[in-house]
From Swiss-Prot:
Its main location: secreted. It comes from Dictyostelium discoideum. This is Protein psiR. Glycans are attached at N79, N117, N323, N396, N428, N474, N500, N645, N779. NCBIfam families: Fibro_Slime. InterPro entries: Fibro_Slime, PA14/GLEYA, PA14_dom, Prespore-cell_inducing_factor, S_mold_repeat.
């Protein structure tokens, strides 16, 4: 979304300067650089527009806005914790940066000051945008692909003297809040497009001529542009103006068109410069382009030019171009392309795939493998699909690459026994039957033709044997008639010739004995008569009465001619038997009825379910049903009866997780609450909760049902078990420890991250200590550091002799030549320009002088220079100066040798020898002392005493040398170590030539 940064007064420390002629206002402020990876409020998704009431209407007690909603989210703000880093220093989350902004007086209305910048990226390359310090932070870019720092918050605080008619106008986007007299007068919160506001101070009830506080807060939280536009008539205070009318100016801002607007150095280096009220206002080097798909290019020494936008990416499988409609690069994927190291390989024939070469610089064709290892198929590829066409009449052989194809089905091609060749094997159509004549016809079909065995003799039987062929057997009882044979095979049916011997006729044999209860027949083929009695047959007047079911036998009726039925009786007069006649044999069946009890000769009681037996009543006149008793006396069983094929089986199933009590069964369904027998009443169950207490205060103990699993969850990652309560540390810079009374206390660590170097800025980030060096700073002896500005190296800030204050020492550039004009440049370089027409006077012998030093430090009295000698403090070291006995340069000598204790700071060297000056200018706080450890001065606790190689004198032990090794007992905290445990290294003697 488009960003228009709205700023008036920037950041925490805010000095606004104003001149008599009202040319400019200089705004000094503090900016807090944030990043989306550390605070999700920045680059938040969505655009919700202007959202009011995100902060309370009255400024907080610390001079910053108060978030509306505590720990609850609102639109693009997550909670109070994330909002805290907007306007407060939170190490590890944000970075503070000082910046200025200059408002210019209006030419048409001297009471109005304004500032406008449509590319206001105030901290590009700084803070989290500095890749030399934060290489892993993401780079955010504008619509043209240029990297910028889009995520920061600023605050500004000042006073103004109210006058009637005062106004304050601005336009911009994202969060802006303005407080006048601690009351909110502008409320433009949220991520939004450009929004404007105007404040008429006459409506605020202010008193003319009276001073009021003015507090301004702004956050830029989203890509992709940044603008600022300000107009105000407020009379902000300024203590001093220079001759150019610049508030707190240095007198160098006056300019002319020649050295500003038309300066070729600016133009050829892509810098826009313009004189405004004698101030040369310059921009950062920047080249723009208004044509789509082009960008501005700055060539130092030449100027701006327009070049096509480079849309080529590292993917060789995209079609890279610039879309002039949206003025943006687009990368269209190339179908069927493989991205190689230096080229893209495109496959157009899917049967011949394009792949990367081994070095990635060219493409290689890889034909698709369609071999199915079947020698009876034709393998081809079409559009990347393998096609396998079957070869008709083909047989795969076992040999390599062998397939045998048959073209004549009567003479097929088959595999040889070894499978390595094809042989012709004529088709065998014989079925092994001598009665068939085999042959093979077209298409490989077998034909079997029957053999003709007819011998033309009617009284021979012509047949064929599958093994011997045709057989001609004489036919017995054959009468040869005219062209026909009449053969008697059954003498119950004799064959004779009729019709003049042209046909045969059959004459049946008669066999009747006149008895209706016999079956008369002729026995073939012998022709003998047979008279068989009919079983169970009664001859009733020539009629047959045959009994087939002896339960229903047939007898002659009263007339002696017809048949009558006489049923068989089988009653045994027992009510518990089933009486029946068994057909057809007529046997009586009196089967006992299972489970039947005879109550009398008529009534029987039958049990069909053995679990519910049927018995006779007491007087035997009726049947009574009862239940089988399966009770086992156990309260933790389910008792039942089961009918197993007529047998009653008692089932006593145990109830799981049940305890058998005297009068009840107690069943547990949730093992977090076990059911047990009551100790006082055997008919009652008691619930006993599972004890999951692990005895630790830093865990939350619970039972997970129904399985009864104990859970012990830590209440915090860093928790200490103290006597009376758990102690939780949430901030590594403020650890919580156990107090003497067993309760939690905040551990007081004085100067936790203080490295005792007054030329560093020490902070605790929650992860570790950070020590940022202060450029141009020197440590003094008594607790201060003196910093020389980088733009004023001619005025060195040096330590006073006592080390408790800073002195300004002007760099001496006098070259003792009367014919040069001597001056010092701001960079600290002396410049000695010859004076035209000047004649150098003859040399005159004079007393010795003290040569200038690179530090410009004057002479002071030193601790141990010989009497009559002076010294210079050069980079914190004493250099003694011996006066010259004759004219010329004094002689520089070394400082004092031996040891020193410094000035009331307890400084001393390790072994009492060596260079004492390493600690002489190294200041340590109370309770700390300076020690030279391995040739480096360090502030360590007063109880520290470490040895080094000078203490051991390994050379006195013979052919030995000394090594410094890591101390295994070293304690890194300078507040917790004592004696040897404060030493990082300890010396050991080893034979020469030995290596660690």
């Amino acid at each position: 979304m488009k960003k228009i940064i709205l700023m008036l007064l920037l950041f925490s420390i805010f000095f606004i300067l104003k001149s008599e002629s009202q040319n400019t206002l200089v705004l000094n402020a503090l900016i807090y650089d944030n990043t989306p990876s550390r605070n999700p409020d920045f680059e938040a998704s969505g655009s919700v527009g202007v959202q009011k009431n995100l902060v309370k209407s009255v400024l907080g007690s610390d001079g910053t806005p108060v978030y509306c909603c505590g720990n609850s989210p609102s639109a693009t703000i997550h909670n109070q914790t994330t909002f805290q880093s907007w306007f407060h220093n939170v190490p590890g989350v944000n970075l503070p940066i000082q910046k200025d902004i200059i408002l210019t007086q209006s030419l048409s209305n001297p009471n109005i000051y304004s500032y406008s910048n449509d590319s206001y990226f105030v901290i590009d390359g700084q803070g989290f945008d500095d890749k030399s310090v934060y290489p892993n932070e993401r780079v955010y870019r504008d619509a043209f692909g240029n990297p910028h720092n889009f995520h920061f918050c600023l605050q500004a605080h000042t006073e103004f003297q109210y006058k009637t008619g005062d106004v304050f106008n601005f336009a911009g986007d994202d969060d802006v809040w303005v407080f006048i007299n601690n009351i909110l007068v502008v409320d433009l919160g949220g991520i939004h497009t450009i929004a404007s506001a105007s404040v008429n101070l006459d409506l605020l009830g202010l008193t003319p001529g009276q001073n009021y506080p003015f507090d301004f807060f702004y956050c830029e939280r989203h890509t992709v542009e940044s603008h600022i536009r300000i107009e105000t008539s407020l009379a902000f205070k300024c203590p001093r103006y220079d001759e150019c009318g610049v508030c707190e100016g240095d007198g160098t801002s006056c300019c002319t068109p020649n050295n500003c607007d038309n300066n070729p150095i600016y133009r050829t280096n892509c810098i826009t410069a313009k004189c405004s009220n004698n101030v040369c206002v310059t921009s950062a080097p920047y080249c723009s382009s208004t044509e789509p798909c082009t960008v501005g290019l700055c060539t130092p020494g030449v100027g701006c030019s327009v070049v096509p936008k480079n849309c080529v990416n590292e993917n060789h499988c995209t079609q890279d171009s610039c879309n002039s409609t949206i003025n943006a690069c687009q990368h269209d994927p190339i179908p069927d392309c493989i991205n190689c190291a230096y080229i893209g390989c495109i496959t157009t024939d899917y049967c011949n795939e394009q792949v990367c070469s081994a070095d990635g610089r060219s493409c290689e064709t890889r034909p698709k493998n369609c071999d199915d290892l079947n020698f009876c198929t034709v393998d081809t590829c079409s559009n990347g699909v393998c096609i396998y066409t079957r070869i008709d009449n083909c047989v795969n052989c076992t040999g390599p690459g062998i397939g045998c194809i048959t073209t004549d089905q009567c003479n097929p091609n088959v595999c040889s026994p070894d499978g390595n060749s094809c042989i012709i094997q004529p088709k065998n159509c014989s079925d092994g039957n001598a009665c068939n004549d085999p042959s093979c016809v077209s298409g490989g079909m077998c034909m079997l033709t029957p053999v003709n065995c007819d011998d033309g003799d009617d009284c021979t039987f012509d047949s064929c044997s599958s093994t011997v062929g045709c057989i001609h057997t004489n036919i017995s009882n054959c009468v040869e008639c005219q062209n026909i044979a009449c053969i008697t095979t059954d003498f119950c049916n004799v064959k004779i010739c009729i019709n003049n011997g042209t046909t045969c006729d059959t004459v049946p044999k008669t066999c009747d004995d006149g008895d209706s209860c016999t079956i008369d027949s002729c026995v073939s083929p012998s022709g003998a008569c047979l008279y068989e009695p009919i079983a169970n047959c009664v001859n009733c007047g020539g009629n047959q009465c045959i009994t087939t079911d002896f339960c229903l036998p047939l007898i002659c009726g009263p007339d002696g001619v017809t048949c009558a039925v006489e049923p068989k009786k089988c009653d045994d007069f027992n009510p518990c038997t089933f009486d029946s006649c068994i057909s057809p044999q007529g046997d009586c069946g009196n089967a006992p009825i299972p489970g039947c009890v005879a109550c009398n000769e008529i009534l029987g009681c039958t049990t069909t379910d053995p679990c519910h037996p049927i018995t006779c009543s007491a007087i035997g006149d009726q049947c009574v049903s009862t239940d089988k008793d399966c009770e086992d006396g156990n309260h933790c069983t389910i008792n039942s009866c089961q009918n197993n094929n007529g047998t009653a089986t008692c089932l006593n199933s145990l109830i799981t997780h049940c305890t058998d009590c005297p009068g009840i069964g107690c069943t547990t369904t949730d093992f977090c609450f076990q059911q047990v027998c009551s100790a006082t009443d055997g008919d009652v169950c008691t619930t006993v909760p599972l004890n999951c207490d692990d005895g630790l205060q830093c865990t939350v103990d619970s039972c997970i049902g129904p399985m009864g699993v104990c859970s012990h969850i830590a209440i915090a990652p860093k928790c200490l078990e103290c006597a009376l309560e758990p102690c939780i540390t949430t901030d590594n810079c403020q650890p919580v420890i156990c107090g003497p009374d067993g309760r939690c206390i905040q551990e007081t660590i004085e100067d936790f991250c203080d490295d005792y170097n007054y030329c560093t800025v020490d902070t605790c980030t929650g992860v570790g200590c950070e020590h940022a060096s202060i450029s141009g700073c020197r440590n003094c002896t008594n607790g201060i550091g003196c910093t020389t500005p980088s733009d004023d190296a001619c005025n060195l800030q040096v330590c006073s002799e006592t080390g408790d204050s800073c002195l300004t020492m002007v760099l001496n550039c006098d070259d003792n030549n009367d014919c040069t004009e001597d001056k010092c440049l701001n960079t600290g370089i002396c410049q000695n320009n010859p004076i035209d027409g000047c004649v150098t006077p003859s040399p005159v012998s004079i007393g010795g002088t003290i040569p200038p030093t690179t530090t410009g430090v004057s002479q002071v009295e030193c601790d141990c220079c010989p009497i009559g000698q002076k010294c210079l403090l050069v980079n914190g070291h004493e250099i003694c100066i011996k006066p010259a006995t004759t004219g010329g340069i004094p002689e520089l000598t070394t400082g004092c040798a031996g040891t020193t204790t410094g000035r009331a700071t307890g400084h001393y060297t390790e072994s009492g020898t060596g260079n004492p000056h390493l600690c002489d200018r190294y200041h340590c706080k109370r309770g700390m002392e300076c020690h030279v450890v391995n040739g480096v001065p360090e502030c360590l606790p007063s109880n520290y005493k470490c040895l080094d190689c000078l203490d051991l004198h390994c050379e006195r032990q013979g052919d030995f040398t000394c090594f410094m090794v890591k101390n295994p007992n070293f304690i890194s905290s300078k507040h917790s170590c004592y004696g040897e445990s404060c030493c990082k290294f300890t010396p050991v003697c080893k034979p020469k030539g030995h290596s660690l």
